[in-house]
Amino acid sequence: MPRQRLDRRINAQVLLWALGVIIVDTLSKWWARHALGTKGRHVWGPLWLRLTYNGGISFSLDRSGPVVTTLVVLAIVLVVMFVAFQATPGLATVGFGLLLGGGVSNEIDRLVRVPHQVTDFISVGWFPIFNLADASVTVGFIVLMVAMLRGSSLVQR
């Protein structure tokens, strides 16, 4: 397959994974804002659904304020996009798509929500409350680590 055609296919795969994350995460946050009350819902064991809002980046980290947080996240997203569009076929495209989708989805939520906070609603008790975009970023990172451990190059040379 010619290099240019392969590049377009990889770009499309990364963007499809990212778009899937953005859609699912946005719908889950909408549901959480409309369905969860102030008490939350016990699901099973330590898992609770509790609505809260987070001004930080991920898992309530870095509360520097909306401008700094937005600039940091946008810089990270641009770097991930640059690297992702040079990804090798396979696990790397999935990992980069999950990273990109999670970062973009949280940033969309932060930009449209006043006072520039992200909707979080998944609680496991001992860990900061998070959302599906946070989980997507974490899983994307793990997928990239697995790809590297299997000897895959993450980007084309």
Predicted regions and their residues:
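Alpha-helical transmembrane bundles and membrane-interface segments of multipass inner-membrane proteins
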Residues: 1-157
